[in-house]
């Protein structure tokens, strides 16, 4: 076929009004460019005068091409199994001309009848062959004189010149965006106003019928576009195209500031705003700004409470589709992201990139004040607030201030009592999502953070950091009153209350106040009388699981914690810590009434009851009251029948285990109470106290 016999109708593509609506604004603009180029190519190659088609006239005037009314017979594509972007909802694709049907069907049958005689490469369309053949000509590359840019094809040069020469006189009054054609401006205007296409499933509205069609696929689970490499399917062709670059590894878009490369141009544009600091999309409610418009849209739903994306499994709603997709992987078990180091798979890219061990993390962001380094710049920024002391976020309920807005929001849940994050396993609720995530590891047993010193594993990184201080002996949090050091800040906060006398946790039943929330929790069980934790050996019940565990060691007789000074062994690590203070002579807890000092806060609390005459532990048999619970337990054995605690050495029986322990010293010769004046030792504290009067 000679080029002279080609007409514009052979290389033009026609759209009906319905077809035109399926196209996005980008696709419409591309169509206009291609048609104008095809016409220019035809004029250039034909070598004689070609009459200007109506389609070109309309495009030059900025009118929409579907307005042309043709008389030709209509044809239709019957390949309903195709993955053609335009075909949707099971409808046939209609064409006005049989020639257009023939060209379209080559997409499905793979037919490429036009072959290059130079290199034997085949093409579906004659115009593609014509453009390709210019590669083999000996012509010098075409160059734009204005920009000194060279092109291998004349069509590429013409396209470049049109882009740079074209005026854009049509400006949007809403956002100021400019367009070359009024039709493009009219189409763009719908962004700000019309959304005539509404989804009957969820009520979400769209500007075009095509957007609605694509949206329907999410409800029906339709994913017609499948990757031939890995089999993953997508509901939109564009997502398949983006996905395929994962397999090729191609990242053609490079940042000219830092050299980082991206698979998509959109990804590069978003990245570049990091360097410029530009955040053009601002929320009118709270003033927060975003780099991407989609992030602003998602953020606005926080104010409106809208959660349009609902999980069909559990009914949970989400503000954006990505959150729903991540959530649904809980049920499907999908884990698309695999670590090349150890083969471990993850359900999200964030989990994959999150550090598994502290060794693997690069920390390029260093604080100039203290030298601490961070893997993420945002963490450095937050850390620097510690040095500046600024706390700009104040709670309007209690006046407490915070460095971070997120910390304020979490704090406010204390006043509202809101705990929106609930565990599906046990029903326990949390005020923070992170706390729920950590809690979930109790059920799964997942402990990814391992200590290199002793091999002990932990559910979260912060627990490991605190644990490592046992090996290093580091106590970075120091009390300014007494100089005592602590391994983490929470212990220092509680310790300070010893000096200030602050007791913020009050019992609503009796008005008693406590310095630690855990003490209040323990105290409340006195009023309820509940003892839900029962020993399976002897049937004894306890209010707390920790006390039950301590009790069970009696049956096992195991004492794994040994004192390095004297060799004495203990069932609990805390007991060993308290015992160590005996050797060190450390008594940091002082009574404000009489000045007596104690090695443990609990001993001070019990001692203070002497001054207040507080005896909260009452015997239900005789009504006698005691300062501490252990005295009550010992007393209750008086009412019990028999003496259940028998000495294995001599057979003597006692009412309580405490009395038996004291008796054992007769056989062992143990005298733990030493006089600091003359170094004489005694079996009982009371005998030591009598002895010390000699030295007064």
From Swiss-Prot:
ZnF region ranges: C2H2-type: 114-136, 142-164, 170-192, 197-219, 225-247, 253-275, 281-303, 309-331, 365-387, 393-415, 421-443, 449-471, 477-499, 505-527, 533-555, 561-583, 589-611, 617-639, 645-667, 673-695
InterPro entries (alphabetical): C2H2-ZF_domain, KRAB, KRAB_dom_sf, Znf_C2H2_sf, Znf_C2H2_type
Subcellular location as annotated: Nucleus
Pfam families found in the cross-reference section: KRAB, zf-C2H2
UniProt main location, coarse: nucleus
Gene Ontology terms, MF aspect: DNA-binding transcription factor activity, RNA polymerase II-specific; RNA polymerase II cis-regulatory region sequence-specific DNA binding; zinc ion binding
Keywords for this protein: DNA-binding, Metal-binding, Nucleus, Repeat, Transcription, Transcription regulation, Zinc, Zinc-finger
Superkingdom field: Eukaryota
BP GO terms, sorted: regulation of transcription by RNA polymerase II
A GO cellular-component term linked to this record: nucleus
Sequence ranges assigned to domain KRAB in this UniProt record: 6-78
Known role: May be involved in transcriptional regulation.
Protein family per UniProt: Belongs to the krueppel C2H2-type zinc-finger protein family.
Annotated protein name in UniProt: Zinc finger protein 607
Origin species: Homo sapiens
Higher taxonomy: Eukaryota, Metazoa, Chordata, Craniata, Vertebrata
Gene name for this UniProt entry: ZNF607
């Amino acid at each position: 076929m000679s080029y002279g016999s080609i007409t514009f109708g052979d290389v033009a593509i026609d759209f009906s009004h319905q077809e035109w609506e399926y196209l996005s604004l980008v696709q419409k603009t591309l169509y206009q460019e291609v048609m104008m180029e095809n016409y220019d190519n035809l004029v250039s190659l034909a070598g004689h005068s070609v009459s200007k088609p109506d389609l070109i006239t309309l495009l030059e005037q900025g009118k929409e091409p579907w307005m042309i009314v043709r008389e030709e017979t209509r044809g239709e594509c019957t390949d309903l199994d195709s993955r053609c972007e335009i075909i949707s909802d099971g409808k046939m694709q209609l064409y006005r001309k049989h020639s257009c049907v023939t060209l379209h069907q080559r997409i499905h049958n793979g037919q490429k009848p036009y072959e290059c005689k130079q290199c034997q490469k085949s093409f579906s369309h004659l115009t593609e062959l014509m453009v390709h053949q210019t590669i083999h000509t000996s012509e010098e590359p075409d160059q734009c004189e204005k920009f000194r840019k060279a092109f291998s094809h004349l069509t590429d040069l013409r396209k470049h010149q049109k882009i740079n020469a074209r005026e854009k006189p049509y400006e949007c009054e809403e956002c100021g965006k400019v367009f070359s054609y009024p039709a493009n401006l009219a189409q763009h205007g719908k962004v700000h106003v019309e959304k005539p296409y509404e989804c009957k499933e969820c009520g979400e509205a769209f500007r075009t019928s095509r957007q609605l069609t694509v949206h329907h696929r999410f409800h029906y689970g339709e994913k017609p576009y499948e990757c031939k490499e890995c089999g993953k399917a997508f509901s939109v062709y564009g997502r398949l195209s983006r996905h395929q670059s994962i397999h090729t590894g191609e990242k053609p878009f490079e940042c000219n500031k830092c050299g980082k490369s991206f698979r998509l141009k959109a990804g590069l544009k978003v990245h570049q705003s990091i360097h410029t600091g530009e955040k053009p999309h601002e929320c009118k409610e709270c003033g927060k700004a975003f780099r991407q418009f989609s992030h602003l849209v998602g953020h606005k739903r926080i104010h409106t409470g809208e959660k349009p994306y609902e999980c069909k499994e559990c009914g949970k709603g989400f503000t954006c589709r990505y959150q729903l997709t991540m959530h649904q992987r809980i049920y499907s078990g999908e884990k698309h992201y695999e670590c090349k180091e150890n083969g471990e798979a993850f359900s999200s890219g964030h989990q994959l990139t999150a550090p598994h061990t502290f060794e693997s993390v690069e920390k390029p962001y260093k604080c100039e004040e203290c030298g601490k380094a961070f893997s993420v710049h945002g963490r450095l920024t937050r850390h620097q607030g510690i040095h500046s002391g600024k706390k700009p976020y104040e709670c309007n309920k209690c006046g407490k201030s915070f460095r971070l807005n997120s910390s304020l929001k979490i704090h406010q849940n204390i006043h509202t009592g809101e705990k929106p994050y609930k565990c599906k396993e046990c029903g326990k609720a949390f005020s923070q999502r992170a706390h729920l995530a950590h809690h979930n590891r109790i059920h799964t047993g997942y402990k990814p953070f391992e200590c290199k010193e002793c091999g002990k594993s932990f559910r979260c990184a912060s627990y490991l950091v605190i644990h490592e201080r046992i090996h290093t002996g580091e106590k970075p949090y120091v009390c300014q009153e007494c100089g005592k050091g602590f391994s983490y800040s929470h212990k220092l906060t509680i310790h300070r209350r010893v000096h200030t006398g602050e007791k913020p946790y009050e019992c609503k039943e009796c008005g008693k106040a406590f310095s630690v929330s855990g003490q209040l929790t323990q105290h409340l069980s006195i009023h309820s009388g509940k003892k839900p934790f029962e020993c399976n050996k002897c049937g004894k019940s306890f209010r707390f699981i920790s006390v039950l565990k301590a009790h069970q060691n009696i049956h096992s007789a195991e004492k794994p914690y040994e004192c390095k000074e004297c060799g004495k062994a203990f069932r609990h690590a805390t007991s060993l810590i308290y015992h160590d203070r005996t050797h060190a002579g450390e008594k940091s807890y002082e009574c404000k009434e009489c000045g007596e000092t104690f090695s443990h806060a609990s001993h001070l609390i019990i001692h203070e009851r002497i001054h207040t005459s507080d005896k909260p532990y009452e015997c239900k048999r005789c009504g006698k009251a005691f300062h501490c619970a252990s005295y009550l337990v010992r007393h209750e054995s008086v009412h019990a029948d028999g003496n259940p605690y028998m000495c294995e050495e001599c057979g003597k029986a006692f009412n309580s285990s405490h009395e038996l322990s004291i008796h054992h010293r007769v056989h062992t010769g143990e005298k733990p109470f030493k006089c600091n004046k003359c170094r004489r030792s005694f079996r009982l504290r009371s005998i030591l106290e009598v002895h010390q009067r000699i030295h007064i």
